[in-house]
């Protein structure tokens, strides 16, 4: 019998290798042999732990949530299996802000028993500075198949944070996906949708020149023209009705719970000036698109 491919999972802040999320991951991706990696609040130490595990296992799939997603952005992809998939959920790219504004300072208790035996950790200004210095001093690594999924209703990161983190991941080369229903915590349903519509490659790419209908919070239909991978952005097309630009990736997805993001490159004032934080682009149904192509 053929052995299973190796995979690693990296948990979020305040958790550990015994996170209950790994049970969901194992159930949905049962054809992989999963190893949970326990990390901490020190980014340099945590990334070293991840890279040590990668060097031992050479995984074909890397998955991380929240802070674990951020750490995986700096993982040693060269030591992974060739063509490995890196999939991060709600990465906490602005973790220092989240700690200051949402989580708060103080002594915290880990949600689960830890392998290192430590059950409490401290969040303070020095921890925030450590995260900020790490992000400023290191560059995310590049992979061949990098994906980042964001929950639109992420209550921990917040709407502005989600938009900022999408930009960070996009600029790092990730394909951006949206979960329209979930919150910050990874849902089993989100994982199942991801497997069906991402890992099985069940998606349809648009033709160059297609007009793609998307929804915004403003009335009326708005369109984006697909110019193909790496096409130049046209600075003259500064009308809300039609965004013209280089599309990182456009995929058709009619499942109500999961939408592939339509992303204009580069994410800049051109993009942000016409799309408010409420207007995260959402693809229409296949029926709507059929009338346009």
Enumerate the predicted regions with their spans.
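The alpha/beta-hydrolase serine catalytic core
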Residues: 84-200
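Active-site signature of alpha/beta-hydrolase-fold catalytic machinery across serine-
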Residues: 74-78
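Short beta-strand-centered aromatic/proline hotspots
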Residues: 222-251
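Gly/Ala-rich beta-loop-alpha elbow adjacent to hydrolase catalytic centers
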Residues: 63-72
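Active-site catalytic motif of lipid deacylating hydrolases and related acyltransferases
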Residues: 2-57, 184
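Short coil-to-beta transition motif at edge beta-strands of beta-rich domains
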Residues: 203-232
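Intrinsically disordered, low-complexity, charged/polar segments
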Residues: 252-293
């Amino acid at each position: 019998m053929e052995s299973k491919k190796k995979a690693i999972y990296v948990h979020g802040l305040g958790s550990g290798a015994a996170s209950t999320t790994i049970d969901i991951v194992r159930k949905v991706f049962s054809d992989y042999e999963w190893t949970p990696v326990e990390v901490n609040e020190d980014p340099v130490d945590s990334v070293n732990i991840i890279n040590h595990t990668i060097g031992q296992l050479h995984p074909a799939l890397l998955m991380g949530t929240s802070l674990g997603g951020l750490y995986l952005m700096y993982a040693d992809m060269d030591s992974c299996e060739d063509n490995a998939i890196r999939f991060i959920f709600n990465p906490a790219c602005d973790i220092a802000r989240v700690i200051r504004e949402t989580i708060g300072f103080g002594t915290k208790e880990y949600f689960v028993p830890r392998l290192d035996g430590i059950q409490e950790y401290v969040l303070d200004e020095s921890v925030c500075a450590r995260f900020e210095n790490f992000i400023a001093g290191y560059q995310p690594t590049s992979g061949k198949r990098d994906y980042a999924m964001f929950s639109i209703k992420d209550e921990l990161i917040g709407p502005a944070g989600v938009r900022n983190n999408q930009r960070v991941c996009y600029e790092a080369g990730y394909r951006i996906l949206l979960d329209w229903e979930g919150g910050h915590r990874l849902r089993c349903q989100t994982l199942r949708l991801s497997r069906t519509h991402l890992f099985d490659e069940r998606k349809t790419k648009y033709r160059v020149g297609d007009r793609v209908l998307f929804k915004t919070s403003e009335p009326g239909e708005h369109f984006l023209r697909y110019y193909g991978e790496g096409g130049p952005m046209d600075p003259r097309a500064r009308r809300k009705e039609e965004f013209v630009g280089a599309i990182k990736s456009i995929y058709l997805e009619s499942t109500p719970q999961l939408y592939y993001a339509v992303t204009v490159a580069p994410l800049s004032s051109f993009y942000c000036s016409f799309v408010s934080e409420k207007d995260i682009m959402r693809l229409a149904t296949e029926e709507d698109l059929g009338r346009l192509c």
